[in-house]
């Protein structure tokens, strides 16, 4: 199989707008984000971002994905490639879903595709934990600001 999807979610006791404010404040990432330590770039579709991640079971790495989508207080997505298109691609998504009680469900996912997915499946699966940690730290950070 040449694709793998990792999906996590968490409920945050804050509005989507409040979560969005923190999620898109890239300068604050170093103070709360355990996984994505640095993001440089603007929130414009087509923009090349510069992202530094620190997976718990791998070395830190930097990559330059292209911003695919930005919907204020709703969703954010980018697409990155390892070396060349089709070798190992990752489409990263954050989706903010408003709940009836005024809270937010964050759906945090990535779909990996390409020729290297079968060989890297176990390494890629370990990223689920990093997403879960990041989600938890985001929740704590957002809720502490209320």
Positions of predicted regions on the chain:
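Hydrophobic-ligand binding "helix-grip"
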Residues: 40, 57-103, 111-113, 140
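Generic structural detector for well-ordered beta-strands
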Residues: 9-13, 52, 66, 95
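Hydrophobic pocket/interface hotspot
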Residues: 19-23, 29, 49-51, 67, ...
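Hydrophobic ligand-binding cavity/cleft-lining segments
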Residues: 1-44
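A conserved amphipathic terminal alpha-helix motif
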Residues: 111-146
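Generic amphipathic, hydrophobic interface segment in small proteins and small subunits
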Residues: 39-56
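Short, solvent-exposed secondary-structure boundary motifs
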Residues: 1, 27-33, 55-60, 83-87
